[in-house]
């Protein structure tokens, strides 16, 4: 990623602001697969009761402490499942993101993938980690599907959309679906002041 960042800087048009440096996870096989300026988005349209906020806070605390098995047990409890499927799915996606950072791609995919397809509109970042885990484990079609879904979700920052669109193009190319590459590259390139947008414009 540092080399790609330097390349992006060297090819940056004069009047454009420099792209933000990508933030990389601690362990990754593909260095470009860091956060890359992804902005965490709110859970649009989903209601949070006091109980829901408290339980999600417990999940976040367990995830931060890397107690992922405990977090998975918590969301299986009746009091959590009573919140509804979307809340359970958001918790699963959050747990899956930590499995990804720990290098457990299979666990990340199994935890986050179905949850992202069901409830990714509330937590688009779930598609990001499910997509990266899929890509890193060689499931390129699955990766492309997740990145496409994230890129198509409205209300995100230009950083998030350009990153998802760029990786959708990349995953489709590796998955030998060249007919699906140009659309996503164009979408990424429509945000030229972002890291991935600038890369897309040079491809």
Model feature map: region roles:
Residues 2-3, 15, 47-57, 83-94, ...:
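Generic helix N-cap/helix-start motif at coil->alpha-helix transitions
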Residues 1, 12-14, 25-32, 41-48, ...:
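Solenoid-like repeat scaffolds
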């Amino acid at each position: 990623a540092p080399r790609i960042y330097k390349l992006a800087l060297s090819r940056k048009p004069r009047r454009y602001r420099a792209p933000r440096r990508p933030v990389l996870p601690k362990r990754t096989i593909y260095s470009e697969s860091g956060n890359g300026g992804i902005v965490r988005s709110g859970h649009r349209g989903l209601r949070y009761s006091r109980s829901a906020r408290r339980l999600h806070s417990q999940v976040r605390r367990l995830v931060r402490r890397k107690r992922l098995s405990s977090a998975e047990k918590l969301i299986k409890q009746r009091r959590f499942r009573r919140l509804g499927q979307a809340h359970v799915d958001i918790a699963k996606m959050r747990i899956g993101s930590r499995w990804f950072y720990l290098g457990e791609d299979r666990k990340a995919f199994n935890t986050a993938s179905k949850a992202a397809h069901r409830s990714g509109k509330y937590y688009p970042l779930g598609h990001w980690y499910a997509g990266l885990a899929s890509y890193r484990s060689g499931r390129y079609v699955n990766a492309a599907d997740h990145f496409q879904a994230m890129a198509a979700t409205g209300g995100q920052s230009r950083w998030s959309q350009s990153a998802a669109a760029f990786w959708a193009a990349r995953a489709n190319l590796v998955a030998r679906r060249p007919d699906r590459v140009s659309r996503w590259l164009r979408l990424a390139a429509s945000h030229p002041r972002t890291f991935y947008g600038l890369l897309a414009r040079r491809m």
